Amino acid sequence: MDYEALKDQWSDVEERDGIRLSWNTFPSTRMEASRLVVPIAAVYTPLKEKPESPLLQYEPVTCKAPCRAVLNPYANVDVRARIWICPFCLMRNPLPPHYKDITENAIPPELHPQSTTIEYQLARPAPAPPIFVYVVDTCQEEDSLKALKDTLILSLSLLPPNALVGLITFGTMAQVHELGYTECAKSYVFRGSKDYAAKQVQEMLGLLAPGPRPNVPQQPARPPVGPAARFLLPVQQAEFQITNVLEQLQRDPWPVANDKRPLRCTGVALSVAVGLLETSFQNAGGRVMVFTSGPATEGPGHVVGPELKEPIRSHHDIDRDNIKYYKKAVKFYDALAKRAANNGHVVDIFAGCLDQVGLLEMKNLSNFTGGHMLLTDSFTSSQFKQSFVRVFDKDANDNLLMGFNASLEVLTTKELKVTGLIGHAVSLNKKSSSVGETECGIGNTCAWKMCGIDPASSYGVYFEIANQGGPAAVQPGPQRGMMQFLTYYQHSSGHYHLRVTTVARPLSGPTGDPALAQSFDQEAAAVLMARIAVYKADVDDGPDVIRWVDRMLIRLCSRFADYRKDDPTSFRLEKNFTLYPQFMFHLRRSQFLQVFNNSPDETAFYRHVLNHEDVGDSLVMIQPTLDSYSLEHEGSQPVLLDSASIQPTHILLLDTFFHILIFHGETIAEWRKAGYQDQEGYENLKALLEQPKEDARELIADRFPLPRFIVCDAGGSQARFLLSKLNPSTTHTTGGYGGGVTSQTIFTDDVSLQTFMDHLMK
């Protein structure tokens, strides 16, 4: 089968099952697996939208404990004897009575060969409607606060009518607004400088009265009773009150001297929000949405002092350990993040500020709970407004696309063991026969809790081969290894859903089976390795991680490339390996591993987004796409990410996922400034200038977070965004800049790979 046909097959599987594997044939022994260099792993998108597949309105048929695998197309079903054999543990299970009418030709949907991914609506209702707590920073300029209030008021109309909404505002103090009190505006005030224990918060808010007990089913239609109902009201009942309170929000009245930062107690506000949901709504889906316009400067979790002369920490300070607030703040926010994750609640962080706000310290609030993280210059920007509205996207039945309180469990057949997950989740510490001995990412468990999950949420799941090898280990006949992914989540319609994906792949034959190399998916592998590199970069030194990336690439090439010793020119890679070295070249230059020129907050944001997206979008972040437009060609043409692609008569469109940039070559820019496009007879120039804008609009259409849109000319200051991504060819400097300026510092792709190959031969 040629590579193109294989690629089509893999993308069909991705469409159907939301999964891409690094190797589509599994090695049969652990020894063989270790020689593959890239681990056996999957990028899995559990909630990938599948509008055409049916939602099954009954409970799934499961295997006996401890296996609990769900009936799937790979199970052997004996129609006459009414039994099925589980492919994971080989146990025989009776089919339930309502399956009595099945025949060879009439089988239930979950046994259809195409039903490798299927979704069940479970009978178990959600304990409460979805909850949204807005936590709003009032230490900001009037125009920015007004823009934020308008966006929040607009968002009320996007929530399900039964959703519960709460409001906490913070500046020097944190205030919990009692929305249920209609006579006048009433709020509970917490001192910004004090670290409140969870119990204190709950006592002060009067929440320790007997609330709805967990594990006792409640009718989903009734709004919850209990003390928290004063602070959290159903939108349909209280939209007017909430709108009123939001409209009347004022800037924080505390005076701020010119040489000081405003006192901002982000930590206290977050701790109160988590405490509010913890008592009455444990394991009910909820989101704490924080809107901050500056760093926390007071109380627990502050990241910088109030004096402006003291700058907020940079990467350089962190490297030199010159960080007096960092460790304490991280410890505080991590403890909060763990509490929120255990309760099943999501924390989203929206920053509207030109300076850093302390995302680096707060990042695990979103990373542990599956929350969103958004970094914008101001709440007045369209980037913030449009991205925020996109959080509330709905499906065809007008249900929110976000799932709440989710968990993912992975089962494997005896050949495979799961070693861990890299993505936005925490471990559920569940042990089973599927758990491996080694650890990659969040390991030593076969189940993880996500809290927040949406149709784009993707997870890297890593595996190892259990089989030690030896003559008895290889059985005759074709073998296959299997994995099953079970995703439970609270759907916004008020029911729990279960999405089941079952994957089977052949096991390789005896050592040296060529099927292994042919089954390598270089795109999925690059993304899975990038996730490991970023995971390492959070704990290890930057240069060490880049050395690790290089080492892994050298080992992969020495294993799979054809070359004659001491003859670099003889180096050849198979078609499905050729792009992998350049993905790695761009990964090591990317903002995920090179922190130079980015603030620690930006680095935390970029890494957060990489760990959320699927293979296609992650690849755009690692190796941006570049398209060229000119009068000679109709439409756009993909060109190399290289300074040789800059031509005076071409327009370039660069997509880095976070930025979309239109770059006008020198001549085109001069024509445009001279106004030729508005003159008669130059319609083709006008069309040429419009075309990239149209294409950029399409790229932006369904992307979250909304990318920054930049239009620039050759030689303009904004052109730096393009130049920093290009591979500077040293062979020909383009028009005297671009290549010429940077070619001394960064070697070209070819040279680096060439040196690389020379080292390899040695």
Curated annotation (Swiss-Prot):
The keyword Protease does not apply. Zn(2+) binds at C63, C67, C86, C89. One of its GO terms (biological process) is COPII-coated vesicle cargo loading. Keywords: Cytoplasm, Cytoplasmic vesicle, Endoplasmic reticulum, ER-Golgi transport, Golgi apparatus, Membrane, Metal-binding, Protein transport, Transport, Zinc. It is a peripheral membrane protein. It holds the Pfam family Gelsolin. GO terms for cellular component: COPII vesicle coat; endoplasmic reticulum exit site; endoplasmic reticulum membrane; Golgi membrane. GO terms for molecular function: GTPase activator activity; zinc ion binding. It is found in: Cytoplasm; Cytoplasmic vesicle, COPII-coated vesicle membrane; Endoplasmic reticulum membrane; Golgi apparatus membrane. CDD domains: Sec23-like, Sec23_C. Its main location: cytoplasm. PANTHER family: PROTEIN TRANSPORT PROTEIN SEC23 (PTHR11141:SF0). Belongs to the SEC23/SEC24 family. SEC23 subfamily. Component of the coat protein complex II (COPII) which promotes the formation of transport vesicles from the endoplasmic reticulum (ER). The coat has two main functions, the physical deformation of the endoplasmic reticulum membrane into vesicles and the selection of cargo molecules. The COPII coat is composed of at least 5 proteins: the sec23/24 complex, the sec13/31 complex, and the protein sar1. This is Protein transport protein sec23.
